[in-house]
Amino acid sequence: MNGKRPAEPGPARVGKKGKKEVMAEFSDAVTEETLKKQVAEAWSRRTPFSHEVIVMDMDPFLHCVIPNFIQSQDFLEGLQKELMNLDFHEKYNDLYKFQQSDDLKKRREPHISTLRKILFEDFRSWLSDISKIDLESTIDMSCAKYEFTDALLCHDDELEGRRIAFILYLVPPWDRSMGGTLDLYSIDEHFQPKQIVKSLIPSWNKLVFFEVSPVSFHQVSEVLSEEKSRLSISGWFHGPSLTRPPNYFEPPIPRSPHIPQDHEILYDWINPTYLDMDYQVQIQEEFEESSEILLKEFLKPEKFTKVCEALEHGHVEWSSRGPPNKRFYEKAEESKLPEILKECMKLFRSEALFLLLSNFTGLKLHFLAPSEEDEMNDKKEAETTDITEEGTSHSPPEPENNQMAISNNSQQSNEQTDPEPEENETKKESSVPMCQGELRHWKTGHYTLIHDHSKAEFALDLILYCGCEGWEPEYGGFTSYIAKGEDEELLTVNPESNSLALVYRDRETLKFVKHINHRSLEQKKTFPNRTGFWDFSFIYYE
């Protein structure tokens, strides 16, 4: 059973070169002159319009649905077969996970070629007439296949030249419980996406198209069916771009210097192994080599148990953090935290921890930590001693800054310097080490995204994980570091209970937390009362 209507044999002919050509048309009811004028008037006036062959709505932005786009079912079945025989490539980054075909612009398969002509000649002409937009002949289309846990998160599709987006669905019988809906977002006063206000369910031969604009935020929700594939052809009609509103910049998250707190707080909270000076030297050597380290069993067991109990059973007030084109997770209201969690937050802001992190990393996060200049003087003194005692030194010269950040520049020459060295040196000399942090709750559907205004700067990331027992990488929720402008992963940090992750990143490195998919619900089999996991997330600046 495939739920499709019985098909009449579609017309076919043999082309000049002996190749089979197939014929098809899009819904002639849509092209009927009276209806066409009504649709054009609704588009012009930005008013809703509903008819059995086409529906236009303005909420939350202009979009249209043609339930039965192609007239020949036989053609659609032939098209589906050709598409399923294409090579698909996995598309995977912070924003999406699905499979995509190569560009269909030059494919010669008969059904694909015919659909291309229908869309970018016949339908484009009709669309130009009703929208009064001078749409170009640019062909921009591909085939996408979404399977279990695949998704495309919130975005606006806006790119130079894109005017109208379209999706033609070729799916088996489908309902809302299977996911894969096209979700449309409302916007707030800053033209940022706010919440999903409409979800369009895929169905066989349904065409959806919408105007690409600064407010056309949408997503493909996660596919929840383990048996069925969500197959579609999508693309854009190009034309003159709309004027964008001024960019909105979120208020910066406040940073604060350390809280005066003596070293006793470390002895109360932290595994004594990590307070041993010799072990700290070992940690620093490893950190300076790779710019990242995972310190397991970081908190004392009794403290960590109390923290987890407070998170799991305590009265923590959570609020959702957005907007969804940048992030979606829950943040704790710090002023209302149970006392044990307040104390843990205080630990990560304490003067003693700033100094401990300096010892772990070699960064100057405390005035007692040695500066690069101090280290250079020590090295010069040591080299002088070597030359005096041995007559010569066979050690290779050390680079001026031995603290390498996580970066896509794995082999930097000694001549590479900061773009603004003098300004940065002044900042370093006059700046006070700062931090910002929050307690986060991660569960199914949560994520963070890299966006146009993601700030890339030198920083030390600290994450302490809680409630991650049984958590698998395939669930998502890991923190991924990538080179700016690239999809290549430089480092992945997987959630691990009572493990402290430290990562030093540079201006060419960005990070995101991968979308947590529905596989994560398997955690409930072992921990029925637990939903996701938690982390204490802090960023430190020299």
From Swiss-Prot:
Keyword field contains Metal-binding: yes
Ligand binding (2-oxoglutarate): 169, 230
Annotated Fe cation binding sites: 155, 157, 218
Cofactor(s), by name: Fe(2+); L-ascorbate
PROSITE patterns: FE2OG_OXY
Motif Nuclear localization signal per UniProt: ranges: 4-20
KW Nucleotide-binding (keyword) present: no
Bound cofactor: record note: Binds 1 Fe(2+) ion per subunit.
Span of domain Fe2OG dioxygenase: 134-239
Reaction equation(s) it catalyzes: [ribosomal protein uS12]-L-proline + 2-oxoglutarate + O2 = [ribosomal protein uS12]-(3S)-3-hydroxy-L-proline + succinate + CO2
Keywords from the named record: Cytoplasm, Dioxygenase, Iron, Metal-binding, Nucleus, Oxidoreductase, Vitamin C
GO CC terms of this entry: cytoplasm; cytoplasmic stress granule; cytosol; nucleoplasm
PANTHER family cross-referenced by the UniProt entry: HISTONE ACETYLTRANSFERASE COMPLEX (PTHR12117), PROLYL 3-HYDROXYLASE OGFOD1 (PTHR12117:SF0)
Function per UniProt: Prolyl 3-hydroxylase that catalyzes 3-hydroxylation of 'Pro-62' of small ribosomal subunit uS12 (RPS23), thereby regulating protein translation termination efficiency. Involved in stress granule formation.
Family designation: Belongs to the TPA1 family.
Protein's name in the database: Prolyl 3-hydroxylase OGFOD1
Organism of derivation: Homo sapiens (Human)
Organism lineage: Eukaryota, Metazoa, Chordata, Craniata, Vertebrata
